[in-house]
Amino acid sequence: MLLWLTNFLSQHFHAFRVFNYLTFRSIVSALTALILVLSLSPRLIKYLVSLQVGQMVRNDGPQTHLKKSGTPTMGGVLIIVAIVISVLLWGDLSNRFIWVILLVTVAFSAIGWMDDYRKIIRKNSKGLSARSKYLLQSIIGALAAVYLYFSATTGAETALVIPFLKNVLPNLGLFYIVLAYFVIVGSSNAVNLTDGLDGLALMPTVMIGAALGVFAYTTRNHFFAQYLAIPYIPGAGEVVVFCSALVGAGLGFLWYNTYPAQVFMGDVGSLGLGAALGVTAVVVRQELVYFLMGGIFVAETLSVILQVGYFKLSGGKRIFRMAPLHHHFELKGWPEPKVIVRFWIITFILVLCGLATLKLR
């Protein structure tokens, strides 16, 4: 929004030309989101407390979680709002990638909001039925995938980047739609499953979001793309503004969400942020690298799938003490902060490995 104004002003005042630089707009986007969340979170927490919008804790979970009951939730609304405001202010609103990512993020957050709302109103931890939630996610994910496929202007936008292999970029054709759909929907649910401890999902989301911003920056530049043997995607650079806003908003919220959490982001935050990472990975053509960097999300999801499947096949036996995986380690006696920080460390290592794929080919 401000880019249109500064483009006009820069014709008369040279100082405004700095707003044309992607790096500058990305930095101020992150700072805007960070300041918004840091300054408004205390008021939001008080407001949620006054409304008695408290977390409902399941009785069959770890007993240490019972003390979390009543902690304000749905704070993820502020994360999403801060991201949207920052991107609308500092992004190029004529860029189609920006709008796709924003709309997917907001739509999945809306699903999360409905889920949180039902949990609070009905005073249970069930929320939306799994079928209803998945149906809504599928519609949005499929629409986004179809749009990205048919709006592609170059073959590079639908090519699959295979890590560590140089000049191997198979065009997916219509299979692109299937892959994009599963990445968006799967990512949303994976982050949601991981968001079971204070800050556990948020810090990995921030780290991966920053890394995807690096990929977006390199993909936008023809010279960088050619040198690194990755697809050149015109317009993908604006995604950096979104990633920066995500990082800023995430860090700001983490200030209040870190152990012991003063507020939870709820499904409105985790579903939206998960979808944001997924659709961003699709846009910058780094689905497989995202699978690597989001190893914690993958492990958490697989632990649930394996646990449920084995439980049904074995007649009640379990692989893990409890799923998702972070609960397994809690029941083994690991303190919650230890589980959180170790998962963060693993994600940091995986993100470095993901960034290394830019050069190791």
Curated annotation (Swiss-Prot):
One MF annotation (Gene Ontology) recorded for this entry: UDP-N-acetylmuramoyl-L-alanyl-D-glutamyl-meso-2,6-diaminopimelyl-D-alanyl-D-alanine:undecaprenyl-phosphate transferase activity
The metabolic or biological pathway listed in the UniProt record of this protein is:
Cell wall biogenesis; peptidoglycan biosynthesis
Which GO cellular component term is one of those annotated? plasma membrane
What EC number(s) would the UniProt record show? Answer: 2.7.8.13
Cofactors needed by this protein, per the record, are: Mg(2+)
Q: Could you say which protein family the record assigns here?
A: Belongs to the glycosyltransferase 4 family. MraY subfamily.
| Protein name in UniProt | Phospho-N-acetylmuramoyl-pentapeptide-transferase
Q: Which organism is it from?
A: Coxiella burnetii (strain RSA 331 / Henzerling II)
Phylogenetic placement of the source organism: Bacteria, Pseudomonadati, Pseudomonadota, Gammaproteobacteria, Legionellales
